[in-house]
Amino acid sequence: MIPALIVPILNQPELLVKMLASINQPVEQIIVIDNGRAIGESHPPLVGCGVEATTVHLPCNLGVAASWNLGIKLTPHAPYWLIVNHDIEFGLGDLARLEEQIDPREAGVWLIFGLAAFAITRHTINAVGFFDEGIHPAYNEDLDFMRRVDLLGLPRHEVGFTGTHVGSATIHSDPVLRAANGFTHAANDRYYERKWGGPKLGGETFSTPFNRGGHMGDWRLDLETLRANAWPRR
């Protein structure tokens, strides 16, 4: 049984319903982080593989990294977490392969479909640290995490994926959010470059965050960044 599944959402709850319906392996806990009041009080119960999801309703967009971190903190006893985008639909056998391949005693990352659907263990978090909430509200938090994974020499396991992924569904469905992302994505690129001494995907020069020689989980939550990068409420 998959111990915990975490999925943030900002809009398009119909895609979330499809994702949950595609879960074809038992899951102990499903945590939905609702960042945009997408799931109203009158919405039918969210169910995946017979398990009713716990929905955390937030008054504003916490951001991807903070949502993933919150899901982990809400299920601290889980040996591992499956973290997914709401616009994924799993294929038959995808989650069964994950259960066959994952070793909760190991630190690493199990990639079902890149960082749109992946699993990490408590040992991964202990080694790598939590997701960097200074990257807000979305884009680059996955690259930053995998940069730390790779620097520590932790393995990437390719589980395989036979399902479907819409891709960037949140911003493509809303021109206001798409415009806001144009600003915040560039701001997150600049933050990433400060943190790693160069641009993402090959230009990095630092081997520790901010070249400070500390733990890989070294990051700073900056209130000014949260204010500047906040997307409009929808």
Which residue ranges define each predicted feature?
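Short, well-formed alpha-helical segments that are part of the catalytic scaffolds
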Residues: N11-Q25
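A conserved acidic beta->alpha catalytic loop
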Residues: S22, V32-P45, I88-E89
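Short beta-strand/loop segment that forms part of the nucleotide-sugar
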Residues: E28-R37, V56-L58
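Glycine-rich, basic loop-to-helix element that forms the pyrophosphate-binding segment
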Residues: L58-T75
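Short beta-strand-to-loop acidic/aromatic patch adjacent to the donor-nucleotide binding site
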Residues: A78-E89
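Conserved donor-nucleotide/metal-binding helix-loop-beta segment in metal-dependent transferases, i.e.
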Residues: L95-V109
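Conserved nucleotide-sugar donor-binding
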Residues: A116-G129
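C-terminal catalytic/acceptor-binding lobe
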Residues: P137, L143-R234
